[in-house]
Amino acid sequence: DSDIEGQPAHAGNAPQLGHNALMAACAASMMLQGIPRNGDGATRVSVGTMHAGEGRNVIPAHARLQMEVRGETEEVNGYMRDYVYDIFAGVDKAYRVKSTLTKAGESTTLLQSPALFDKVEDVMRHVPNTTLLPRIHAPSGSEDCALFIRRVIQHGGQAAFILWGCNHHGHHRQNFDIQDERS
């Protein structure tokens, strides 16, 4: 996430005295979307919220972005993270503002224990009304599970990630429902 501090000024009487945090946040948002993708793995960028401004006739002195970048591997995630820092350094200079970046979370490569794959499939074959689909070798999303699984493996345990399919209309939507009618 980013907190951007500018300099307020009266938009009509002395706009030259202001350093517009809102415009800096807008510029950063557009540049984040333009980070070049990486041939070593999939990448994602999301600016989810922007809050800025104090009034219609005031050069905005404060802006806050809630955002994230993701990379398929830790190396690609680092590539994305480095771009974020470079973008905000440039925005700070161009708009004469001060950005403070805060890591609010992260994702990591989803490591699994291949020794569990056959065991999990054997158990799933005995679950009524379940159809096994081909294995997904590089599942995406579920950053919380990726972090949990990594910690289990680091402590000598084994873990596997299971996707339980359902007929829904997309994640993170207001009408999200896994349509589980039997549990």
Where are the predicted features?
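Midchain, well-structured core segments that form catalytic/ion-binding scaffolds
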Residues: D1-L111
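An extended, acidic, His-containing surface patch that forms the Zn2+-binding/catalytic region
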Residues: A104-S183
